[in-house]
């Protein structure tokens, strides 16, 4: 929990999520315990440093089984950003979402000024589906939030999972 909490307290993470204040470790511990009891699908992102796996992020799918869709959330440690790990982790998570969980659509929200995140999501197969006007804050200023989504047909093959099936 402390590792994830540290990543979330990074100023760039706070800005990227549009939060105005950090969260206490106690509150985050309760929040993670609640999340782990739910139906969320979580994956830890690892970076192979000198051949040793080191956790550097997490991806999460928050499924809505009644309509076979899920919200997507990703968080990377500050030291893991800009290396392509977020895009790779997003592609793998989408592969799982579409080929194992059989979701029909995955969506996310991102603050419009967060251009690096928008580009990474586009590289992974997401498209802008709409704009939530004045829905967030970026560096203390009101900003729009983009709604992005992707379908199985939007995600480029190859699938890591498909070859494993008989």
Each predicted region: which residue ranges?
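Conserved active-site tyrosine of GNAT-family acetyltransferases
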Residues: 121, 126, 148
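Helix-loop element at the rim of GNAT/NAT acetyltransferase active sites that forms part
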Residues: 6-20
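Conserved catalytic-core motifs of GNAT/GCN5-like acyltransferases
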Residues: 107-110, 127-144
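A short coil/beta-turn micro-motif at the C-terminal edge
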Residues: 65, 112-114, 142
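Conserved GNAT acetyl-CoA-binding A-motif
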Residues: 99-109
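Hydrophobic alpha-helical core bundles mediating ligand binding, dimerization, or RNAP-core interactions
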Residues: 4-9, 28, 32
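Acetyl-CoA-dependent GNAT
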Residues: 16-81, 101, 151-155, 163-166
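Conserved acetyl-CoA-binding loop-helix of GNAT-fold acetyltransferases
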Residues: 76, 82-96, 115-123
């Amino acid at each position: 929990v402390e590792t994830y909490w540290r990543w979330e307290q990074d100023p760039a993470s706070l800005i990227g999520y549009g939060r105005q204040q950090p969260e206490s470790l106690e509150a985050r511990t309760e929040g993670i315990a609640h999340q782990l009891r739910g139906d969320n699908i979580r994956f830890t992102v690892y970076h192979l440093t000198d051949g040793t796996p080191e956790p550097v992020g997490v991806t999460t799918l928050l499924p809505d089984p009644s309509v076979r869709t899920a919200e997507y959330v990703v968080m990377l440690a500050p030291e893991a950003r800009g290396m392509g790990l977020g895009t790779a982790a997003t592609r793998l998570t989408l592969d799982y979402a579409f080929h194992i969980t059989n979701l029909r659509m995955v969506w996310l929200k991102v603050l419009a000024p967060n251009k690096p995140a928008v580009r990474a999501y586009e590289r992974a197969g997401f498209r802008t589906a709409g704009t939530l006007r004045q829905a967030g804050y970026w560096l203390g200023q009101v900003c729009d939030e983009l709604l992005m989504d992707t379908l199985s047909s939007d995600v480029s093959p190859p699938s890591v999972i498909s070859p494993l099936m008989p």
